[in-house]
Amino acid sequence: MNTTTYIGHCRISFFNISSQGFWENLKSPDVVFGYSLPLLEIQIILIFFCIVMSHMFLRCIGVSQIVSYMIAGLILGPQLFDILEKSSGKLSADPALDGTAALRCISVFGRLMFTFLMTVRTSRRVAFHSGKLPVVIGIVSFFAPLFSLSFLNLFTDNIDPHYMSLDKALAERTVIVITQSQILLPSTTYILLELKIINSELGRLALSASAINDMLGIFAMIVATTQATYIHVSHAIAYRDLVAVIIFFLIVFFVFKPMVQWIIDRTPEDKPVEDIYIHAVILTAFASAAYFVFFNMKYVLGPLIIGIIIPEGPPLGSALEAKFERLTMNVFLPISITFSAMRCDGLRILSQFTDIYFNIFLTLLILVIKLVACLTLCLYYKLPRSESLAVSLILSYKSFVEFVLYEAVLEEKFISQATYAFLILYSLLSAGIVPMVVRSMYDPKRKYVNYQKRDILHLEANSGLRILTCLHKPENVSETIAFLQLFSSPIHDFPIAVTVLHLVKLVGQINPIIVSHDKKLKRLHKNSYIHTANLAFRQFMQESLESVTVTTFTAFSHENLMHEDICTLALDRTTSMIVVPSGRKWTVDGMFESDDLAARQLNQSLLDRAPCSIGILVDRGQFSRKSYVTSKNRYNIDVGVLFIGGKDDREALSLVKRMKYNPRVRVTVIRLIFDHEIESEWDYILDNEGLKDLKSTESNEDILYTERIVTSVVEVVKAVQLLAEEYDLMVVGRDHDMTSQDLSGLTEWVELPELGVIGDLLAARDLNSKVSVLVVQQQQQQT
């Protein structure tokens, strides 16, 4: 099929689209290169073949797949372009419709979609959530490298006029300084996701600093483009373009933003956004790109600004991501990155090294200035050395996101092909080396290392208790309040400070964020579950006669990174214990219903990393229902503590001792004693010290104490099953180091290892009981 277009009165431009295959001319099979569709198909096949082959080797040494995209472009570059040059004459007599036309269109489309989706998934609000330090770093990291502008006039005598005129050479140096000074937020976000530290304190700091820097960069880009138009084109056109940009911002903020909010408001909760609105938003993003091109601005600015306006997360943000992310990230983005790298001719760096060596010097100088500036600020604000260096490297990271800028200035002839090739190779080295260096020097687990005692056992007897509770689903609210009611007391000398954290799986945004409900964000209050839960906790606080204070937060986070948000908040709130639901769900009759594997995995991560003690609550239903029933008797909640021995049991004992001030709770401590020699004398001494005040009935009237002698594992199991029928809630330690040999025979039958041996027995599916269980692990002290 041929398309013929008449242009003016003197030239015919034809463009061959589809062919009849290789058999169209068997003597010359390369005839297919004269048709755009077969050529595009061959290009895409070669691109993904080289990507797959490159990644097969690079993934063995931990290099990200993005580097494979770049290397595929370098492999295909000069060789493929030779083929394209041969095909251009066959494809079209119009030089604009050469062999790269179709591939370039896909590349631009991919770049637009990627920029739009990344800004939709990236919340700029993160810039204001980490205090003063990221703001200072963001500003300094942008302006400090501009100091290198003072070196622009060095070695101007050595500029070869055949390479570039003096004015253009100085403009090229200026472009390098500006592009290298800017830190693109999507680039920072990508490396943090790759390193899986986006939820860490370091990740939040880097994101915030990058957001500030990126805002300054966008403003500088608009000013620089307007100035270039003013100087090289026309004063009137420059003013027109600037006014057009201002009008665009006004339309976006006062027309498009309210329309987006209207779409969100009219979408029922838990219902998808209608396709017509999704398509309208996408078309608006494309229209904004065309608008900016018409007014001589970078086309990516339009989708970027449109993406910023769209609220992250459900319903609209997540709908856009679900509909377009896979196609963009798995098809269009690889083609876009590879196409940009295909334009890189590494041989030009060698042949024109004397012409670009000063550009290389400027790039490295800016890198050093940025590293030193960020490192100095981080050390000044008392960050550890390793974290300071990691932040500096992350903010100096260059990757495929910068290709948009490089290609734009190349097409406008602000930089040469040799400089472009160097910048591509520089980004390739940065994308491959920086993640491995940061990974080797920074472990996110170190964030939660705590050398101070952060448990209940070591609290002062009359000090307040700080607890962090986590909620996954609406049914977690009642069981959590029921547990907290055990500590409420009319005695105000023993206050309880509760931090409630709603855990929301991140779907439509890329940046995790923790929001305090004291700020009354509209979108959060429109979530009926969270709003209702907050009202329930507020009522609980009012009914507790000021003995309990409750602060609520919501964490939007990725499922596999939620433990980092929990640990960070636990550190910030100086909590002594984190309480999380087990993930095992029961029916109203106490029958097993389901297991939440994601919740169980989260609990295991917390057990390994928590900076304080942790409790896992298994609620069969009766405990939470009974806590709301007011009994005429003094006690209506029976809590049993099964004490075998070890630090976790001592922590569990310290916890229940704080329940004795609640007149509705009766606590019984049952100690199981094995009739053989104790393995650890020191643990035995510590156990007796913790139980000493309970053994004396005169000094302790609120907690009952009893001992049972067991001779075998079978008797332990029978004792646990009998106790499960007597109490509403059983509190047990997770590990029992002292008697590991006695309980070792049960470990191979454990279904829920995060609950330990005894906890697993009490939470077993076939246990004919309605008892709820709290499994306690004392803070894992790091050395």
UniProtKB/Swiss-Prot annotation:
Specifically expressed in pollen. One of its GO terms (biological process) is proton transmembrane transport. This is Cation/H(+) antiporter 11. The chain crosses the membrane at residues 31-51, 61-81, 101-120, 135-155, 175-195, 205-225, 244-264, 276-295, 300-322, 360-380, 389-409, 418-438. It is found in: Membrane. Gene3D superfamilies: 1.20.1530.20. GO terms for molecular function: antiporter activity. The lineage of its organism: Eukaryota, Viridiplantae, Streptophyta, Embryophyta, Tracheophyta. Its main location: membrane.
